[in-house]
């Protein structure tokens, strides 16, 4: 973990949480906190590409994990526009092909940490069955 980079990423992460729809009306679904923590553990136990591939799949979880992958990409790139579903996977794959997978893994991990920290700036909320946040 690069503390300086994490500090640089926190404001980007705060914005990315809102831009990707993870945070809504000042609240964030608590399930996203658990998902981002398990993503970090998955990177530590396996590979960054396999973790991204798993989290890029639309599964039966309370949290839309594809939004987390988009948020991580937005934090790394500093982008706020439309982000493709597989943008983070494509980015890390390109870095791997350039021989920079270790650096890319560090950036992804730091972005995930920044997102986890930025989530604390939002009020906890729960998703109702309609998919909107309740406070």
Residue ranges: model-predicted function:
Residues 1-135:
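Small/polar/charged residue-enriched interaction surfaces, especially the RNA/DNA-contacting tracks
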């Amino acid at each position: 973990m690069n503390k300086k980079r994490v500090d640089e990423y926190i404001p980007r992460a705060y914005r990315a949480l809102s831009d990707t729809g993870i945070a809504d009306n000042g609240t964030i679904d608590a399930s996203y906190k658990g998902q981002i923590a398990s993503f970090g553990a998955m990177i530590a136990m396996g590979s960054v590409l396999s973790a991204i591939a798993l989290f890029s799949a639309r599964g039966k979880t309370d949290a839309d994990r594809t939004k987390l992958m988009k948020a991580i990409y937005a934090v790394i790139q500093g982008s706020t526009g439309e982000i493709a579903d597989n943008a983070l996977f494509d980015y890390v794959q390109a870095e791997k092909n350039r021989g920079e997978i270790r650096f890319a893994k560090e950036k992804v991990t730091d972005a995930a940490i920044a997102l986890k920290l930025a989530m604390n700036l939002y009020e906890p909320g729960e998703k109702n069955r309609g998919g909107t946040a309740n406070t």
